[in-house]
Amino acid sequence: MNSLTGFMCCALLLISPLCMGYTDEDREADSRKVAEIIRNSQDDDSKINSTQELLDIYRRLYPSLTLEDRESIDKFVNEHTDAILIDGVPSQGGRKTKYVGKVLSPAAKGFAIGFFEELGSKIAQLFTG
């Protein structure tokens, strides 16, 4: 019975990397996508509209990050996002940017652009090390 248990543990260790939801190919694709978003977001409106894409990439990347990286970016993101509430309860999606889809004053627009640039920089650093 012990050898069967040992065999099962070894099999699980060998199989578990294959079952991970975020593969190296996914990571590489997201790295290219972040670079593309930053490169193509030249005007203010495109930066504001691309913020949600950066947040989506961060959510996919989240499980593979160190605790320190998660806490750092979570703190930054939470300061600039609203909880999405449905009947007073957070939805499964969780959070959205405060800025997407709104008409912004010049001061708020500058703040939203700063958020995009800082978030993009933080996520890009995760890929480059």
Curated annotation (Swiss-Prot):
InterPro entries per UniProt: Turandot
Gene Ontology BP terms: cellular response to heat; cellular response to mechanical stimulus; cellular response to oxidative stress; cellular response to UV; defense response to bacterium; innate immune response; response to bacterium; response to cold
Record keyword Glycoprotein present: yes
Predominant cellular place of this UniProt entry's protein: secreted
A cellular component term, taken from the record's GO annotations: extracellular space
Keyword annotations: Antibiotic, Antimicrobial, Glycoprotein, Immunity, Innate immunity, Secreted, Signal
Keyword Transmembrane helix appears in the UniProt entry: no
Listed name of the protein: Protein Turandot A
Lineage, highest ranks first: Eukaryota, Metazoa, Ecdysozoa, Arthropoda, Hexapoda
